From Swiss-Prot:
HAMAP family: Ribosomal_bL17. Belongs to the bacterial ribosomal protein bL17 family. Keywords: Ribonucleoprotein, Ribosomal protein. It holds the Pfam family Ribosomal_L17. GO terms for molecular function: structural constituent of ribosome. This is Large ribosomal subunit protein bL17. It comes from Streptococcus mutans serotype c (strain ATCC 700610 / UA159). Part of the 50S ribosomal subunit. Contacts protein L32.
Amino acid sequence: MAYRKLGRTSSQRKAMFRDLTTDLLINESIVTTEARAKEIRKTVEKMITLGKRGNLHARRQAAAFVRNEIASESYDEAKDEYTSTTALQKLFSEIAPRYAERNGGYTRILKTEPRRGDAAPMAIIELV
C-alpha cells in the first residue's frame, strides 16, 4: 500500500490524520499542505461512507477514528440550557444524508499559492 510518510512516525501521522479529518468534518473546509490534503481525502471519504451506512457497527468504527470534539453549540432560552453537537453526530446527522445519492468523491482539493515561510505547496480541501 502506497502512502506518504510526511516526515513523521506512524503514530504521529495517524494522530495528525485523525485531527485533520475531525477538523474537516466540523468546518467542512480547511487549509493545509497539498500532500496532507491528498492523504486525508482518503480518511474523510471512508468516514462519510461509514456515515452513509449508518448502522451501529459503522457508528462505532467512525467513533474509533473521529475525535470527540464539539462541532456546534447552541443555547435554548426556554429550557435555559446549552446543547452541543459533536463531530460524530454532525457526520451521521448532517453530512452523510447530504451525500446519500453520491457514490464517492465527497471532497474537493483546490491548490492555492505557496506558504510564505517555506514555499510549501498549499491547498484547500473542502466537502463538495
